[in-house]
């Protein structure tokens, strides 16, 4: 995934920032609890293609983002 593209992409619903999950090939919006797929290195930023995060996924991502960097 191109780093420059990641810097300018925002959530199409709330216009908020996204978290890139390389292993899952998804861009996640914590505000809306949505995960947008990345297919063949192309982000699919459509509401209809996004999946809702489970409560467990959401909590894990929030905790990971809040953890201090050592």
From Swiss-Prot:
PANTHER family per UniProt: PROTEIN PREY, MITOCHONDRIAL, ZGC:162634
Designated name of the protein: UPF0434 protein MCA0634
One cellular component term from this protein's GO annotations in UniProt: cytosol
Pfam families in UniProt: Trm112p (PF03966)
Database matches in InterPro entries: Trm112-like (IPR005651)
Species assigned in the record: Methylococcus capsulatus (strain ATCC 33009 / NCIMB 11132 / Bath)
Family note: Belongs to the UPF0434 family.
């Amino acid at each position: 995934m191109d780093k420059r593209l990641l810097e300018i992409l925002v959530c199409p619903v709330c216009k908020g920032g996204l978290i890139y999950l390389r292993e899952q090939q998804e861009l996640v919006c914590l505000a809306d609890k949505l995960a947008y797929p990345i297919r063949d290195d192309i982000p699919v930023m459509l509401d209809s293609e996004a999946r809702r995060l489970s409560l467990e996924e959401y909590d894990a991502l929030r905790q990971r983002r809040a953890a201090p960097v050592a």
